[in-house]
Amino acid sequence: MKEHKEVSALLQQAKQERRCCYGTSDAQRRALKRRLHAGELVSPYKNLYADRTLWNTMTREQQSLQVIRALSAIHPQWVFAGLSAACVYGLQHNYSLHDGTVHIASKSGIGGGDEARLNRIYINRIPTRKHNGILLTTPARTLLDCAAFPFPQALPIYDSALRKSLTTIEEVQSLMIQSVCDEVSVTKLLKYADPLSENGGESLMRGQITELSFGIPLLQ
């Protein structure tokens, strides 16, 4: 396909900024769609694009971060939440949790014009923190929302947050009491969360063992 210099420049800038590419004019958007239809690009989210070859070399987490960075640039007021926030904080988790969905905090329900891959997590009062230039729910609030995952999948996220000293058990407990969340799941996760867990694989295994009611491995 004939090179479109503006689009090539957009793709190069996006690569440098480790995010997906997007057009800012109708001409750029049309040119990007032509490359998409030609098979040169992929579109993981509406109006966002990435080089197909480069995209296929990335892990699911890296792909999610590329989308999040682009959406943060387009919608700087968005507060990313749940698994999306966990990714930006660098919390360890199983990549199988990624299904292309982007999670944001919202004081309102689902918008009629929302992209199918956008999930709004209702939060009446949204506690925020900026991390790497991206607006996120605080680590404590992020853990509350990640309690929605199955226990073995959520435990690595909790362990990682405590290991990184992003929050404390007491802070999460305090916020839990003030928030609408799954208190049973959060309480169980806080009971078994351990900052001494060295990596996500170890945390996942410990979570699976706990679920099967075997003895809890002693971490040193």
Where are these regions (language model features)?
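Conserved hydrophobic/aromatic pocket- or pore-lining residues that grip, position, or stack substrates
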Residues: 209
